[in-house]
Amino acid sequence: GGMGLVAACDLALAGPASTFALTEVRLGLAAAMISVPLAARITSRDLSRALLTGERFDAEHARRIGLLTEAVEDLEAAVGDLVDAFRPCSPQGLAENKALLAAPILADLDARGEELAGVTARLFTTAEVAEGMTAFLERRPPSWATPDA
C-alpha cells in the first residue's frame, strides 16, 4: 500500500490534504510485507495502533510518529528546498549513506520475506478476506464489524 511506499522512502514529505491508513485489518488482511519498512520508521506503539485499528490520520500525525520527514503547507516549495539541500552532496557519499540506511530493512526482508509473503498468500484464501473485499466493493461494513455504540 501507499504507507509501505512512503516508509520505503529515505525522505518523505506530505501536504495538509494528505491522509494515511493501514486498512488491511478492515479487509481481513495483515500488512505483512510492508510491516518491515514501517517498523523501521514508526514507533512500535504507533505502528500497533495503525495496524490494529486501520484508523486514518493526517500528515502532521504521520510526521509525529516517524512516517514522514516533514508535514508541510507548501509541498512544491518544500521539495525544492530539499533538492537544494542535496546540491552540495557527493554522489558517492549519498550512495554510501543510502546503503547504510537501507541495510537493516533489506536484511529483515531477506530473513523474513518468504514467511511474510506466505502470510499474505494464506490470508487471501480465507473466507474473511473474501467477505472483506466484497464488503469494500459493495460499500458496506463487513459481517464482523460491530455497530457504533
Question: Where are the regions that the model predicts?
Answer:
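Acidic, divalent-metal-coordinating active-site segment for phosphoryl/phosphodiester hydrolysis
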Residues: 54-61
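Terminal peptide-recognition signature
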Residues: 6, 62, 97, 136
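C-terminal long alpha-helix characteristic of the crotonase
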Residues: 13-18, 68-114, 122, 127, ...
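Short acidic-aromatic low-complexity motifs
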Residues: 54, 127-131, 139
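A general structural signal for well-ordered alpha-helical segments in protein cores
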Residues: 35, 44-47, 91-98, 116-117, ...
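CoA-thioester-processing core
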Residues: 1-51, 64-65, 78-82
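Short, basic/aromatic-enriched C-terminal tail that caps enzymatic domains
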Residues: 132-149
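Short alpha-helical segment immediately N-terminal to, or the first helix within
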Residues: 50-52, 122-123
